Amino acid sequence: MSNQVMLPRESGSFIASHSKDVSLCEEGISRASEIVFKSLKSNAYSYKTWKDHELHPKEMSKATVDWIFVLDTLNFSFWVDDGLEPWTIRHKGKDFQGYWALCAGINRAIEEGIHLTSPSYYRNITIDDLKHIFRSETSTEMPLLEERAKNLRETGNILAQTFQNSFAHMILLANKSAKLLLSMVINNFDCFRDDGDFCNQKVSFYKRAQILIADTWACFEGKGFGEFPDIDFLTMFADYKVPQGLYDLGVLQFSEALKQKLVTGQLIPHGDQLEMEIRGNSIWAVEKIYLAVKLKAKKSPEFSNMDSLELAQYLNSVIIDFYLWDFSKNVEARASIPCHKTRTIFY
């Protein structure tokens, strides 16, 4: 086995070329690229869309960097077992589930005077603290509370001891390089090191590490703490929601055996070949969509005058992932196949 860990883009290509139960449909990629391009071209979708969501912070400050870091330290595994009510946070008279419940819970805690976004606080956080902070309107608790507390303690201690008590200091040390910042995150925090073995090759996905950088970039609109000229180094964020959207768009194809597992709600263990095929093919599918959209952009008057660095800020795999995630959430109730169920801290 090669000890060299492939980065997510290489991993996606490698996994796609060695998969048995997941494949890509070129017609679906072509259709999806047309849909995405129309949305980008009409300015209906850009990094500014991130701040349109009511629960995301609007202020471009160091405090917001700390908010985003806590968000993506906890940004995983919101699905609940069949038959259970969803984990639900009520905030300002509205109920939120899943990822949005996480955002609402962080905001509610801050409003209640809890210093949840300070490493000095969460380096010592307990499960009971998290139970209170993320208390639910239903009988269903936030999943994986013990693992979430462990993540916060790990990252809080390292930020407090090594990085002047803030992820903002790591960003400054990375000197506007998304590539360097990704390396710093995965090398300093075990809970962000999302990799594994596939066909005797070490591969990586780095879902939360990449989305941490992408959320910062989007919130800060590519400026200040969010200035990353190489933002197009990042890939899509291989989770359980975007693959479902890619399947609905006809981009991903699943074997009958895999479809049966999904329809019957069977748990797929983290690190299983099926799980890696879903995630790796999703990365490679979005790369192919990105390349197709990029070709269209270069022929379009809206984008043709931009140089490659400028174009990368408007068009990249991050933006396409954001679009596909929102698409997947919007069609969730009528999706043609359920999400794959893997219980893990990595997504």
UniProtKB/Swiss-Prot annotation:
EC number, UniProt record: 3.2.2.-
Top enzyme class: hydrolase
GO molecular function annotations of the record: hydrolase activity
GO biological process: tRNA-guanine transglycosylation
Reactions it catalyzes: queuosine 5'-phosphate + H2O = queuine + D-ribose 5-phosphate
Residues binding queuine: 53, 237, 239, 321, 326
One matching Pfam family: Q_salvage
Highest taxon of source: Eukaryota
Catalytic residues, chain numbering: 239 (nucleophile or transition state stabilizer)
Keywords: Hydrolase
Keyword Hydrolase included in the entry's annotation: yes
Described purpose of this protein according to its UniProt entry: Catalyzes the hydrolysis of queuosine 5'-phosphate, releasing the nucleobase queuine (q). Is required for salvage of queuine from exogenous queuosine (Q) that is imported and then converted to queuosine 5'-phosphate intracellularly.
Note, other: Eukaryotes lack the canonical genes for de novo biosynthesis of queuosine (Q), present in most bacteria. Therefore, this molecule must be sourced from ingested food and/or the gut microbiota, and metabolized to its corresponding nucleobase, queuine (q), before incorporation into cytoplasmic and mitochondrial tRNAs. Incorporation of q into the anticodon of some tRNAs contributes to translational efficiency and accuracy.
Homology family: Belongs to the QNG1 protein family.
Protein name: Queuosine 5'-phosphate N-glycosylase/hydrolase
Source organism per UniProt: Nematostella vectensis
Organism placement in taxonomy: Eukaryota, Metazoa, Cnidaria, Anthozoa, Hexacorallia
